[in-house]
């Protein structure tokens, strides 16, 4: 199975999470590709059976608005029928950005197949294990 992890990271925290998600996908027998928003056009995602999206909370608990949000908005309606999952880190607040993102996905018909993974600041071992489990669940 061909899978993708599409992520934006400003500090390296979400990038570390993305790598762990890809490890989980690979451990479950999938081919995993790591991509940044700049590397993704809407039609590109048709090549993947499962896609994990990662983005940290920015500002007032929103998705990164310059690169990630425009890419995701352009792609989300074409994700119907694909297995998808979300992950990301945040520095303050209570994770509202993830709940808003999940609701946006639900409204767009995105098939979120497992619970999203969030962590505060730098992911610890437990968060990285949760990311690996997310990658595995997305593939199975």
What do these predicted regions represent?
Residues 2-3, 13-16, 20-37, 43, ...:
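FMN-binding flavodoxin-like domain, especially the glycine-rich phosphate-binding loop
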């Amino acid at each position: 199975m061909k899978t993708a992890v599409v992520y934006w990271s400003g500090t390296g925290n979400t990038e570390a999470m993305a790598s762990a998600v890809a490890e989980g996908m690979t451990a479950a027998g999938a081919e995993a590709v790591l991509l940044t928003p700049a590397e993704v056009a809407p039609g590109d995602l048709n090549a993947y059976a499962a896609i994990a999206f990662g983005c940290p909370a920015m500002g007032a608990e929103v998705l990164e608005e310059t690169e990630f949000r425009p890419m995701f908005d352009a792609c989300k309606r074409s994700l119907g029928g694909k297995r998808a999952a979300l992950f990301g880190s945040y520095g303050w607040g209570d994770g509202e950005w993830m709940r808003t993102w999940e609701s946006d996905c639900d409204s767009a018909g995105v098939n979120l197949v497992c619970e999203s993974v969030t962590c505060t600041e730098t992911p610890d071992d437990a968060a990285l294990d949760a990311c690996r489990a997310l990658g595995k669940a997305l593939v199975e």
